[in-house]
Swiss-Prot record:
Its EC number is 3.4.21.-. Belongs to the peptidase S16 family. Archaeal LonB subfamily. SUPFAM superfamilies: P-loop containing nucleoside triphosphate hydrolases (SSF52540), Ribosomal protein S5 domain 2-like (SSF54211). This is Archaeal Lon protease. It is found in: Cell membrane. ATP binds at G57, E58, P59, G60, T61, G62, K63, S64. Keywords: ATP-binding, Cell membrane, Hydrolase, Membrane, Nucleotide-binding, Protease, Serine protease, Transmembrane, Transmembrane helix. It comes from Thermoplasma volcanium (strain ATCC 51530 / DSM 4299 / JCM 9571 / NBRC 15438 / GSS1). It is a multi-pass membrane protein. The keyword Protease applies. It is an enzyme of class 3 (hydrolase). Pfam families: Lon_C (PF05362), LonB_AAA-LID (PF20436), Mg_chelatase (PF01078), Sigma54_activat (PF00158). The active site is at S525, K568. Residues 145 are extracellular.
């Protein structure tokens, strides 16, 4: 049963605050996640038990925040530093050693001090030998009374210095110093590593290329080893968004790391000198949080998903939440959080809070719901704050939010606005008068971009009926870069206008044109528009051009709900339409801004007959059409269910 909650204005007026500055913002990141209670509990449980998680949902719904909050609930295990040591037996297979957090730096420092001491001792020895040679030369020159011996002694000392100073064995004092791959302090929290979009080397580790590979100039293999994100996330959380975009080889490597809890580091490029280097297995005991949109499952490695499912949880996050008292308070908390995080914008007063909540209602696209696409809603909060700052005010008001909505229109909306102006100038659609076979349909752009906001546009549809080239070989020809679903919608609608008109269309070619759809058409929300245009063309009944319409259509003529209905109604208003026909089931989903209210008559339709009554201009032909429709309905056969017949089995009597 739906809760009858009061209007947003009344609800906000009862809040015991002046601005969002009076709202308490939780310190714990987990408590800042809005509207994901069920997903939050699962993630918390997964963290406590060190389970892996797949989070699936729309962008901006809090998946990364949920993943990041897991580090606060991970069991307090001892973090470890990871060191890589040279391997005297096989230089291309460096050794790996783990020590408690904070000890790695001490060990490296001890080796560095030892190397520096050995270097100083060796330098003293070299200088002693050089001075000895020079001194012997001077003594010999004095004894033999030959100044040339001093010159030869100096030359010998110089050659000796160069030979000893540039000797690879002597020069590589630091070759035995280990490299610290992963470092922590004893007070660090478990690491959270975001590896979204990382290439193979950054994700799995890599061995840098060595341009000097011989002659004593090469860099020791262990010094060229670089830890990957899977190793940096050891004892912590590894987060990968858009998991399906990872290469299959990388997904397979992550699967191996999950199974073994360790993974060796090797060169990722076959052309690199590091390609021949492979370390001992490096610890990588992490909790994997994989996230993605709804299409992520299709391209995810089956074995990796099976591993996560077998040792963890799969969670679908919410796109919207119920519009009730508790969730409205969460939205107010969200506004306060965004202001605190940004640190550059002022707080919001009550009037601004009202506008943000109304926008959340509108973007949900459903009645009695609030959107959870909060990243984009946060963008509106920041733009409104920027406007207030530019006007040198220390409070954000409703006027700032309204101005922000106009200023921060998505690209699709800006393009659509320009497109509508061009279409008006060149009259590709009309807003008055009547035309046979021409309908003002409505569509949305941006539905496939992943954005929360839909942008509505007027989609003129024209139908024309011509005799078929060959008898009995009539075709339905639809043009306008139609997608698969749109093509199927045209075929489905053909059943409706065959039934409504009652005419044999096998001798007709029905041409349907989607005007100006250079970017293509996809979806079935133009079904009622197609049916109306074709019926108008077949029956020669004009269509009222001040009417716009949207809705899907079943083969039986029922008008079905569609998406983005608010954006479509707004497009009809901006185009100057007087009426708009929408599916009856979508009627309560329409949420208009104050600037759009009472500017258009919204007519709900349950069947195609409801659409035709409004869209077709009154005429004798229209009366005949509806008389025909009435006779079809009256003559429809009603099939009564038959009583079930009792069945008998051999050897049984049924009473």
């Amino acid at each position: 049963m739906e809760e009858n909650i009061e209007s947003v204005e009344e609800w906000v007026s009862k809040l015991d605050i002046e601005t969002t500055k009076d709202i308490h913002v939780p310190k714990l990141l987990f408590d800042q996640v809005i509207g994901q209670d069920q997903a939050g509990e699962i993630v918390k449980k997964a963290a406590l038990q060190r389970r892996h998680v797949i989070l699936i949902g729309e962008p901006g719904t809090g998946k990364s925040m949920l993943a990041q909050s897991m580090v606060d609930f991970l069991p307090k295990s001892e973090l470890e530093d990871i060191l890589v040591f040279p391997n005297p037996e096989d230089p291309n297979k460096p050794k790996i050693k783990t020590v408690p957090a904070g000890k790695g730096k001490e060990i490296v420092r001890q080796y560095q001090i030892k190397a520096e001491r050995e270097k100083r001792d060796r330098s003293r020895s070299i200088m002693f030998v050089i001075f000895s040679v020079v001194l012997l030369g001077i003594i010999a020159a004095i004894v033999l009374r030959s100044i040339t011996l001093i010159f030869f002694a100096i030359m010998a000392a110089a050659f000796l210095y160069m030979a000893m100073a540039f000797n690879p064995v002597i020069r590589n004092e630091k070759a035995m110093v280990p490299k610290l791959l992963v470092s922590h302090s004893s007070t660090d929290k478990p690491p959270f590593v975001d590896s979204t979009g990382a290439h193979s080397g950054a994700l799995l580790g890599d061995v840098r290329h060595d341009p000097f590979q011989s002659g004593g100039l090469e860099t020791p293999a262990h010094e060229r080893v670089e830890a990957g994100n899977i190793h940096k996330a050891h004892k912590g959380v590894l987060f990968i968004d858009e998991i399906n975009l990872l290469r299959p080889e990388d997904q397979q490597a992550i699967l191996t790391a999950l199974q073994e809890k360790k993974y060796p580091i090797s060169g990722q490029s076959e052309r690199s000198a590091g390609a021949m280097v492979q370390t001992e297995p490096v610890p990588c005991d992490f909790v994997l949080v994989a996230a993605g949109n709804y299409d992520a499952i299709r391209n995810m490695h089956p074995a990796l998903r099976s591993r996560i499912r077998g040792y963890g949880y799969e969670v679908v996050v919410n796109d919207y939440m119920d519009d009730n008292d508790e969730n409205r308070k969460k939205l107010v908390q969200f506004i306060a959080q965004e202001v605190e995080k940004d640190k550059k914008i002022p707080h919001f007063d009550k009037s601004a809070i009202v506008e943000i909540i109304k926008e959340a209602q509108k973007r949900s696209g459903r009645r009695n719901k609030l959107t959870l696409r909060l990243r984009e809603l946060g963008g509106l909060v920041r733009v409104a704050g920027d406007i207030a700052v530019s006007q040198k005010r220390n409070i954000v008001t409703a006027s700032d939010v309204i101005a922000a909505k106009a200023l921060s229109k998505p690209l699709e909306q800006q393009i659509a606005d320009k497109s509508i102006e061009i279409k008006k100038i060149y009259k590709t659609f009309r807003t008055e008068g009547s035309v046979v076979g021409m309908v003002n349909g409505l569509a949305v752009v941006g539905a496939d971009t992943g954005m929360a906001e839909y942008t509505g546009v007027v989609l003129p549809i024209v139908a024309e009926v011509t005799p078929a080239e060959h008898k009995g070989a009539g075709n339905i020809i639809a043009t306008g870069k139609l997608g698969d679903i749109a093509k199927e919608a045209v075929l489905n609608v053909s059943a409706v206008f065959k039934k409504i008109t009652g005419k044999d269309i096998s001798n007709m070619d029905i041409h349907i044109q989607f005007v100006g759809t250079y970017e293509g058409v996809e979806g079935d929300s133009a079904s009622v528009s197609i049916a109306t245009a074709v019926i108008s063309a077949i029956e020669n009944i004009p269509v009222d051009q001040s009417v716009a319409m949207t809705g899907s259509l079943s083969v039986r003529g029922d008008v079905l709900p569609v998406g983005g209905v608010t954006a479509k109604v707004e497009a009809a208003i901006e185009a100057g339409m007087a009426k708009v026909i929408v599916p009856e089931l979508n009627y309560n989903d329409i949420i208009l801004d104050a600037e759009h209210i009472n500017r258009i008559q919204i007519i709900p339709a349950r069947t195609i007959e409801d659409v035709l009554k409004v869209a077709l201009v009154n005429s004798p032909e229209k009366d005949k059409l509806f008389d025909r429709i009435a006779s079809i309905i009256n003559n429809a056969k009603i099939i009564k269910p038959q009583k079930p017949v009792a069945s008998t089995r051999a050897g049984q009597n049924v009473a």
